[in-house]
């Protein structure tokens, strides 16, 4: 599958993406722009051999979200603008009337498809079908979601374990295996059906292959942080076993993104949120009068794990200082807004105002933090707490999530949880 030359292929691919659980544009008008294949992971000549593995490669779908009504043509200088943000409503303009109708290009998203090609229908992959068409290399084929095809998953894992670098004139796929990867390509792949934004494949009881679906250009934060914490010897996170990067050309620009990662599957793990709720239920059901929550010891251990991670992040990434006066101004504004919405809080305003005012003459330390820390981002294992999902707050931009912040943001997030 490639390009936009065949409308039937484009329609099939767009239908598959828009119906997927991980598609973020539901309810919006979406436009298929292109589909860019990365190099084959398998030899094309092997595809025609009896009982051969399926043809496998990664492909990048570019989608756009145009306005409800098609705008006037965008001048060339504007069309090259690289800002993908939503246009601001109601902004003033001094342009002449004919220029005032020009708007920025519609926002663009890139979706990652791991594709398994087979020459004939596969009885166990009916739900994974993406499209049927004639491929210039392979002839008539059926394209399936590789995440649901165990044979295709093994092809991907073998490429990762081999540290392969695959190149074509306009694209590249790079496989990076960690020095100590506790998984092998013969583990039984099993699709995890509960995930929304990405796709995870369980690799036996040892590892998880996580395919990123809506791509963020640049290095994925979850990979970046796990790699740094593993290198620092931190045991409070899962082991990173490897990751996959892709490069392709769109609109004359080379784009890069992380496509997938393989991470340790944490045996015997319990969700932190459920553990805390169960602790409270047990305490309330008990006839004994307790002065300390049964979860207190777990909470203390979780705090120590977070502190260890903060210390390692401070050593691994850049740090900076910010004006306390700016932080004080922000917090006072939030406090006043909270008191306006809930007048019962007004009695606390004077005391809190005094606390915030004390920040005005300070310089506050900031560093890389988790950024979206709550009980749902924690797992309790037999060996202790593990903290997961370092991609930051989803509503923020990549630059905002990567920027240094106060460690107390993570503490506040956990207390709120």
Task: Cite the ranges covered by each PLM segment.
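Short Lys/Arg-enriched alpha/beta "domain-start" segment
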Residues: 2-44
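Conserved ATP-binding subdomain of kinase catalytic cores across diverse folds
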Residues: 56-60, 65-70, 97, 102-334, ...
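Intrinsically disordered, low-complexity proline-rich tandem-repeat tracts
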Residues: 71-73, 85-87
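Basic polycationic patches enriched in arginine
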Residues: 78-81, 101
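An alpha-helical support segment within catalytic cores of ATP-dependent transferases
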Residues: 179-187, 335-368
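Catalytic-loop of the protein kinase fold
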Residues: 368-371, 375
């Amino acid at each position: 599958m490639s390009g936009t030359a065949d409308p039937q292929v484009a329609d099939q691919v767009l239908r598959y993406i828009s119906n997927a659980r991980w598609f973020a544009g539901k309810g919006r008008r979406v436009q298929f722009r292109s589909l860019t294949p990365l190099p084959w992971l398998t030899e094309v000549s092997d595809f025609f051999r009896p009982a051969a593995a399926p043809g496998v490669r990664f492909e990048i779908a570019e989608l756009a979200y145009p306005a409800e009504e098609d705008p006037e043509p965008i001048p060339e200088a504007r069309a090259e603008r690289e800002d993908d943000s939503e246009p601001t409503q109601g902004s003033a303009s001094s342009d002449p009337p004919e220029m005032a109708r020009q708007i920025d290009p519609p926002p663009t998203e890139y979706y990652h498809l791991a594709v398994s090609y087979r020459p004939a229908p596969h009885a166990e992959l009916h739900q994974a079908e993406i499209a049927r068409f004639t491929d210039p290399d392979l002839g008539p084929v059926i394209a399936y979601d590789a995440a649901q095809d165990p044979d295709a998953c093994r092809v991907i894992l073998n490429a990762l374990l081999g540290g392969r670098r695959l190149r074509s004139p306009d694209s590249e796929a790079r496989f990076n295996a960690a020095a100590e990867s506790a998984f092998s390509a013969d583990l039984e792949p099993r699709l995890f059906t509960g995930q929304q934004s990405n796709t995870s494949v369980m690799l036996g009881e040892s590892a998880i292959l996580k395919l990123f679906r809506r791509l963020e250009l640049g290095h994925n934060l979850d990979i970046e942080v796990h790699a740094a914490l593993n290198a620092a010897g931190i045991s409070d996170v899962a082991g990173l076993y490897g990751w996959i990067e892709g490069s392709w050309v769109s609109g004359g620009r080379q784009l890069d993104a992380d496509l997938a990662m393989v991470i340790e599957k944490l045996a015997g793990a319990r969700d932190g949120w459920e553990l805390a709720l169960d602790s409270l239920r047990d305490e309330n059901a008990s006839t004994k009068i307790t002065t300390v929550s049964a979860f207190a010891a777990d909470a203390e251990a979780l705090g120590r794990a977070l502190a260890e991670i903060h210390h390692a992040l401070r050593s691994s990434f850049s740090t900076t200082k910010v004006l306390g006066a700016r932080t004080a101004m922000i917090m006072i504004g939030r406090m006043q807004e909270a008191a306006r919405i809930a007048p019962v809080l007004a009695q606390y305003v004077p005391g809190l105002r005094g606390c915030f005012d004390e920040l005005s003459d300070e310089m506050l330390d900031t560093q890389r933090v988790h950024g979206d820390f709550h009980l749902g981002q924690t797992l309790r294992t037999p060996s202790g707490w593990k903290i997961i999902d370092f991609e930051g707050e989803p509503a923020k931009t990549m630059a905002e999530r990567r920027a240094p912040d106060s460690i107390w943001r993570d503490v506040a997030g956990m207390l709120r949880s």
